[in-house]
Amino acid sequence: MTTRGLMLVLLLVAPPALAAELPHEVAEFVARRDRCDHFRGEDAENPARIREIQRGLRANCEGTDAALARLKQRFAGHAAARAVLDRYDDAVE
């Protein structure tokens, strides 16, 4: 197997394995915040797409700053959770 093939296999297998060791609340936050970050990175000129992005931002970003702070405090002693949570910006709203 080539190095590229091995990396692809690892990328496909690692996220479910990581999610299995994360507390459910953290895994849910990660999914929501990743959707938020996706919409934050969008740029559009089409008015319909702009409205869709704005809806996505409201649905996925609002409240995540407070949720991140709360989860970091709650799971301060959980190394895997903190490692994942520390990847996110503290203020995106």
Language-model features: where?
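N-terminal signal peptide c-region/cleavage motif recognized by signal peptidases
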Residues: A14-P16
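Short S/T/G/P-rich N-terminal loop/turn motif that feeds into the first structured element of a domain
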Residues: L10-L11
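Compact alpha-helical subdomains of small soluble proteins
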Residues: R40-E93
